[in-house]
Amino acid sequence: MLNIFARASVSRFVEPMGVRLVQAGIGPDTITIIGTVGTVVAALWLYPLGYLLAGTIVITVFVLLDVVDGAVARARGSGTPWGTVLDATCDRIADGAVFAGLTWWCFVVAHDRLLAVAALLCLVSAQVISYIKARAEASGVRADGGMVERAERYIITLLGAGLTGLGVPFALDVALWMLAGLQIVTVIQRMLAVRRSVWDREVP
């Protein structure tokens, strides 16, 4: 839901940046890979070591490149099928790494198995949300929307992790359990959207 409004509000700032990067010979695929590698390294290195605030700051910077690579693609005229698949694949890798890093932190640093369950629920449900949309589109039906998409997922997760890194009690607990619940609702919403789309196509 927030993806549409967030991208629209920042497009006027990143579009000129996209033009300059194209002029410098930097393509969207390069930015996508850099953003993914940076996110994965920060999530699987800083979070497991207990550096929640530092990890959150670094991850936020690299996640923002997801907006920039789209601007670069538009500045070049259009995206490519390869770029679309690469971007979607890298998004899934980055999302998985963030929740894997937080799961490790919950187990090893915080010694909180219950919170680790919440992190794992977030990891699995995030992948399922994306898979439903991809599989639906491959089948010629729609599965857009839902309460939580990628933008909301990162805002909730990084806010909770960052505040916990600053010493705010239970911030990550609230964030992960809330996100897990919202993502389960989103899975249901997308499945219902697929069903409605199929019905609409079947009705003469």
Regions found by a protein language model. Give the residues of each.
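Hydrophobic alpha-helical transmembrane segments
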Residues: 1-63, 97-204
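Hydrophobic, well-structured mid-protein blocks that either form specific transmembrane helices
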Residues: 59-111
